[in-house]
Every structure is written in C-alpha cells, then in structure tokens.
C-alpha cells in the first residue's frame, strides 16, 4: 500500500519506522525545517528518512497547488500525519482513496489542538495517551481507530510524559497499522459533548500567577520545565526561573508571592505554599533553591510578582461608533470594568449609555457618522482601536430600505476603513453571520465555508453582500497595505437592551424583541413560515467577553483573523424560541400586569417582509477560531438568556407605564 507521510518530532520518527515495519510503501516524507529559536530536543525526521533512503521534502506550504499536484502524481493509497505541525487541506487528503490518519498525543476527544502533553500537565490530569484517528476538515475530530492510555505520575514532567506517550504511540501503531493495511480496522465516532480544544503555548504562558494554589503552580512547573523555557516570576526587574518545585501544605496569612523562607526557598501561594527546589536567574546557572535565594539576594517577606512596568503605560483608547447600540453599550460596560481602557463614543442617541456619562474614562458625543466625518477622522487618528458598529441590521429594512442599508452599512463604513488605513490604526470590524447566506455546510467555517446568496431580485441579500464586500476590502487592505484588522461575526446575540419595543412596533427589530412585543401587547405571536428556521442564539455576555478578548489581542493572535462568535449548543427554531419565551413569561412575577396570551399565528414571510425576502433554514457557527485565538467558550444557556431579556423588557415597560 503506497503511503505519503507528514511527520515531525520523535513521534514522527516512530511513525516512519512503524510504517516501514508494517510493510507500507512510503512514497515521500514531508517534514519541517528546524526552528533555530526552538530547543530541538527531539529526533530528526529528515535524518531518519535519509537513513531509510526515502525522499524527504520540507515545503513552506504543502497545501500549495504545485505540491498537491506533485503528490497527486505519486498516487498514494493512504496518508499519515505524525506530529506534523500544519493542517492538511481537504483537497490534499482527498488524493488518498483510503483517507488520511493522524496520531495525536491525547485521549481524544479530550485535548484536541496543540501541545496536548503540556496542557494535560497544566490542568493536573492523571491520565492521557495516544490516539490514531481519521483526518477530517476539523482538527483532531475524525473517527478513532485506536487508543493507548498512559498514567500520569505526580512527578512526571513534559519530557517524561512525552516519552510515555511515545511508547504508547509505538504500541498503538504496531497494533493498528496492519489492520489499516488489510482493511480490518474498526472506527469509533468521537463524542463531541466531551470534546475540549487547546491552542498553542508560548514561553510567555510560563509566567507564575501566585494567587493560584501551590498544586496548580507546580503543575505549570512540571509542564514547562526543561527542555521547555520554564515557569518564571520576577523579583523587581530580575527574572527567576523555576525548574523543580514541591507542594507544601503550609498555612500562612501572607499575600501570594511572599517569600516565607529562603532555606529552603518557600513561596506563599493562594492556597498552600511552594518550595522552589531548583531554579536559576535569567543569566545564571541551574542551582538549588536556597542557593538561588543567596544569588538573587532574596530575603523573607519580599514578594515575587509579574515584571513591573518601567513607566506607567498609557490606557488603550477605544473608539466605538454606534456606542449606544446593543453591542456598543454592553462593550462599553465591559471595557469600563478594566482600568486599561479609555472609551470614545459617538451615536445619535444616549438612552442606553446614560449610565456611563459620569465616568471620567467615557467620552461621548451625540452625532451621525454620515455628518460628523471630521470628528470621526480626528478620533481615528487619536485612538488605538476602532470599532465601527453602526449598521442597519434588521431584516425588514433589507427589503424596505435596501439603498439606505447599502449607503450606511457599506459606503459610510468604507470611509472609516480608509481612515484606519491612512492613520495605521487597528480596526475590529463587525462582519455578520449573514455573509454565509445559504451556505450548505453543517457548520459555518470562517476560513473555508462558501458564501452563497440568492438572486438579485431577492433584495434581502443587500445587507449580506454589503458586509461581505467590506470584509473583502478590509482583507485586501491588510494584505496590500498592512492594515491591522480582525473581523468578528456575531451569531444571533441576545440580551437586555436588544433593540426596543418602539422599533418592534414598526417591525424594525430582531426576532426576540418582536416576540416580546406580542406578549406585552397581547397580540398573536407571528411565526414566519411556521417558525421552523433554526438559529444558534448567543448570550450578550458571552459575546462581549469574546469581543473584549479580541480587543486585548494577546500576543497579536487576532491580527488578520476572522472569528465567529456564537453558541452552537444553543440551537433552536424560532418557534422553540417563542415557546421558551412564553414559558418564561407565564412564570414571571410581573405576568399579571400584561394581557392574556393571544396564541401563535403562522404568517408567510413575503407578506411580512415583502417580495424580496428569502430565509435560511439553519445557521450554525464553527467556533474553532474563537477557541484557538481567544481561549473562549460560550457558557450561558439559552433559557437564561431568554429569561434575562424578557425580564429587562417587562420591567422597563412597567416602569415607563408607572412613570406615565
């Protein structure tokens, strides 16, 4: 059986040898050139390939059409990936009739993604292993061929655990490769409910947070000790690296990071204490903890902590256009909870942000983006991060006022994009789940899903294509002129202050606000085409936390990226949303202040939205980018979001009525 192999690291070497032993005909080996900035403690795939007299390549992009064509000419039957660091495209995988198979260093579906051995130690796991699975579009998500478990000992480090996983991988391959070859392998689908995903780790992730427990800190030390860069902290401006540590059940009343003893060197933690058994300063030698204390002049009661800034860092200035809107006012609230940000905002109203007007870090001007262009350009020049949140985003307006949608959503926002290019400012642009249109993928993927819209006479798509065109323009400015950007795509965010009931009265609101208006006024709940359309509803607090992390942009991971922000587990039809809302309404303490429920009424969408409307049956996001780039996962159940949103509107309605 002819095989193409993508491999790196010790496990890549083990994979090559196992395939050779199993009688596979290896046509070519693809690997990576070694990074001179990395401690290459592992064996060389290139060297093993040469010893086996195999052709070895190390292209920068194996998914490039030229390489795909070369691999096609090799006519592989099967493809293997053993710790190869890049994703293989669907087109490449399709070249092998038997498919592609990857060896992963965890017990999938747990610890998908990068550095699974290190992450397992960081999180204090007691078991991991090796998994051989089929490769699919989503990383580490294909059917499992086989697994071998490995026990994690209390004294295991990343290196010792890696060696255990390597032995498990060798045994697993010896067991399963013959079965794949003769067609007797069995496959088990992964349980998505148990899946977890972890992103890449960098040296900066080794910083010790002393408010954590001694056990958690020791787990970090074990995960990043030699041959990795090590866990570290600071004594003033001087860096201290911890190579080995011991957890102590010591009670104390000191602040975390305080030195309790210098011989042995013991540090107070949020819970318990940590003895530094061995370490070094950043220009010294590997020494015992007590010797390290002597070398660095560490004395009892001093505190280890993060490296202090030499000068006070200026707050990041964030410009929010459309600050009074649903996303804008919730984002302002989140930013003001963090002292690192000053917010500058513009909008045509201030009812939703009135609670912030007395805050010295919030600067607001009432105005229209189509008129106040000079003010906007000045503040783009002045600020660091720009969020143009002004848009018409209610479905009925797409058919009722298509030209106004285009003028505001595209033309006015294009001016802002160009000012960001002009002044070299970072823009975080609100794309939309609408850009996916009638995409037929099960999950909408930022990097691979097709963007499919309807015919020209269906004017509802003018919003989608206006946003999509801006996405493409921003992407092009990034590629050609260095614009720093992130595109985020909200999937049906809900919560308090979403639209208002006056907007719902003229049909210019999102679904849940329209449904709440029906309940408040005692009118029938209108379900367009029976309400069978499914959406994934996302709590505003979950969404804003993801957006906040995009603004933070740790290690620049979000630069040039597109990020879906949605909750795939909160999928429901509009009818199910209405039924959930009705149940919450009937159980609300203010229920008796409102009319009786008038029932459900099925309505044709064309009669409500107009002839140019066209709906979509489902819209489910892939959130792999959000998990990978933001370390973000939605947590709030839809029932809670519905209850919170309803409560806000009911209490607001009663207060306004009592005030009148």
UniProtKB/Swiss-Prot annotation:
Region (Formyltransferase ArnAFT) residue spans: 1-304
Site-annotated residues for Transition state stabilizer: 102
Catalytic activity: UDP-alpha-D-glucuronate + NAD(+) = UDP-beta-L-threo-pentopyranos-4-ulose + CO2 + NADH; UDP-4-amino-4-deoxy-beta-L-arabinose + (6R)-10-formyltetrahydrofolate = UDP-4-deoxy-4-formamido-beta-L-arabinose + (6S)-5,6,7,8-tetrahydrofolate + H(+)
GO CC annotations on file: membrane
Residues at the catalytic site: 104 (proton donor), 434 (proton acceptor), 619 (proton donor)
Site positions per UniProt: Raises pKa of active site His: 140
GO biological process: lipid A biosynthetic process; lipopolysaccharide biosynthetic process; response to antibiotic
EC annotation from Swiss-Prot or TrEMBL: 2.1.2.13, 1.1.1.305
Keyword set includes Lipid metabolism: yes
Keyword field: Antibiotic resistance, Lipid A biosynthesis, Lipid biosynthesis, Lipid metabolism, Lipopolysaccharide biosynthesis, Multifunctional enzyme, NAD, Oxidoreductase, Transferase
Residues annotated to bind (6R)-10-formyltetrahydrofolate: 114, 136-140
Stretches the record annotates as Dehydrogenase ArnADH: 314-660
One MF term in the entry's GO annotations: UDP-4-amino-4-deoxy-L-arabinose formyltransferase activity
Pathway: Nucleotide-sugar biosynthesis; UDP-4-deoxy-4-formamido-beta-L-arabinose biosynthesis; UDP-4-deoxy-4-formamido-beta-L-arabinose from UDP-alpha-D-glucuronate: step 1/3; Nucleotide-sugar biosynthesis; UDP-4-deoxy-4-formamido-beta-L-arabinose biosynthesis; UDP-4-deoxy-4-formamido-beta-L-arabinose from UDP-alpha-D-glucuronate: step 3/3; Bacterial outer membrane biogenesis; lipopolysaccharide biosynthesis
Gene3D superfamilies attached to this UniProt entry: 3.40.50.12230, NAD(P)-binding Rossmann-like Domain
Chain positions recorded as NAD(+) binding sites: 347, 368-369
Binding-site positions, UDP-alpha-D-glucuronate: 393, 398, 432-433, 460, 492, 526-535, 613
Function: Bifunctional enzyme that catalyzes the oxidative decarboxylation of UDP-glucuronic acid (UDP-GlcUA) to UDP-4-keto-arabinose (UDP-Ara4O) and the addition of a formyl group to UDP-4-amino-4-deoxy-L-arabinose (UDP-L-Ara4N) to form UDP-L-4-formamido-arabinose (UDP-L-Ara4FN). The modified arabinose is attached to lipid A and is required for resistance to polymyxin and cationic antimicrobial peptides.
Family: In the N-terminal section; belongs to the Fmt family. UDP-L-Ara4N formyltransferase subfamily. In the C-terminal section; belongs to the NAD(P)-dependent epimerase/dehydratase family. UDP-glucuronic acid decarboxylase subfamily.
Subunit note: Homohexamer, formed by a dimer of trimers.
Name under which the protein is recorded: Bifunctional polymyxin resistance protein ArnA
Organism whose genome encodes this protein: Serratia proteamaculans (strain 568)
């Amino acid at each position: 059986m002819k095989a193409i192999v993508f491999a790196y690291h010790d496990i890549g070497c083990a994979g090559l040898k196992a395939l050779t032993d199993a009688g596979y005909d290896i046509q070519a080996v693809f690997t990576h050139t070694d990074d001179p900035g990395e401690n290459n403690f592992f064996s060389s795939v290139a060297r093993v390939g040469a010893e086996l007299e195999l052709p070895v390549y190390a292209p920068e992009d194996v998914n490039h059409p030229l390489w795909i064509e070369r691999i096609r000419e090799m006519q592989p039957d099967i493809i293997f990936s053993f710790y190869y660091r890049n994703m293989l495209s669907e087109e490449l995988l399709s070249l092998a009739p038997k498919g592609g198979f990857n060896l992963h260093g965890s017990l999938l579906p747990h610890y998908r993604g990068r550095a699974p051995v290190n992450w397992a130690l960081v999180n204090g796991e007691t078991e991991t292993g090796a998994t051989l699975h089929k490769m699919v579009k989503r990383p580490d998500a294909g059917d499992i061929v086989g697994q071998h478990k490995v026990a994690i000992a209390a004294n295991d480090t990343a290196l010792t655990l890696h060696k255990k996983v390597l032995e498990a991988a060798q045994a697993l391959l010896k067991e399963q490769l013959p079965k794949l070859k003769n067609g007797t392998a069995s496959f088990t689908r992964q349980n998505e409910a148990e899946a977890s995903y972890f992103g890449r780790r960098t040296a900066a992730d080794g910083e010790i947070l002393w408010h954590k427990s001694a056990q958690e800190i020791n787990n970090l030390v074990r995960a990043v000790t030699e041959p990795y860069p090590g866990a570290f902290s600071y004594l003033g401006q001087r860096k201290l690296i911890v190579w080995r540590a011991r957890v102590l059940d010591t009670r104390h009343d000191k602040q975390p990071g305080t030195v309790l003893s210098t011989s042995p060197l013991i540090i107070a933690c949020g819970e318990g204490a940590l003895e530094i058994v061995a370490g070094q300063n950043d220009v010294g030698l590997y020494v015992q903890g007590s010797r390290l204390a002597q070398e660095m002049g560490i004395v009892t009661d001093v505190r280890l902590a993060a490296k202090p800034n030499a000068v006070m860092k200026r707050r990041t200035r964030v410009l929010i256009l459309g600050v009074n809107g649903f996303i804008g006012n919730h984002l302002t609230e989140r930013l003001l909870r963090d002292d690192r940000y000053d917010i500058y905002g513009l909008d045509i109203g201030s009812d939703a942000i009135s609670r912030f007007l007395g805050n010295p870090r919030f600067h607001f001007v009432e105005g229209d983006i189509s008129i106040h262009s000079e003010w906007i350009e000045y503040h783009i020049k002045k600020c660091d991060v720009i969020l143009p949140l002004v848009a018409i985003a209610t479905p009925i307006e797409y058919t009722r006022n298509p030209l106004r949608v285009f003028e505001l959503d595209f033309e006015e926002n294009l001016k802002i994009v160009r000012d960001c290019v002009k002044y070299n400012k970072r823009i975080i642009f609100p794309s939309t789940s609408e850009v996916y249109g009638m995409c037929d993928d099960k999950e909408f993927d930022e990097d691979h899903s097709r963007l499919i819209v309807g015919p020209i006479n269906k004017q509802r798509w003018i919003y989608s294509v206006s946003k999509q065109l801006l996405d493409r323009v921003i992407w092009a400015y990034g590629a050609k002129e260095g614009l720093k950007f992130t595109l985020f795509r909200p999937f049906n965010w809900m919560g308090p202050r979403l639209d208002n009931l006056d907007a719902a009265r003229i049909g210019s609101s999102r679904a849940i606000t329209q449904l709440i208006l029906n309940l408040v006024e005692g009118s029938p709940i209108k379900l367009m085409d029976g309400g069978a359309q499914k959406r994934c509803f996302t709590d505003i607090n979950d969404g804003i936390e993801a957006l906040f992390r995009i603004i933070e942009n740790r290690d620049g991971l979000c630069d040039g990226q597109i990020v879906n922000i949605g909750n795939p587990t909160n999928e429901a039809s509009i009818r199910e949303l209405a039924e959930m809302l009705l149940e919450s309404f009937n159980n609300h303490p203010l229920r008796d202040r409102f009319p009786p429920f008038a029932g459900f009424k099925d309505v044709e969408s064309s009669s409500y939205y107009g002839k140019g409307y066209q709906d979509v049956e489902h819209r489910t996001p892939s959130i792999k980018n959000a998990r990978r780039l933001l370390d973000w996962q939605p947590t709030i159940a839809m029932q809670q979001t519905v209850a919170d949103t309803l409560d806000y509107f009911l209490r607001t309605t009663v207060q306004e009525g009592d005030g009148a």
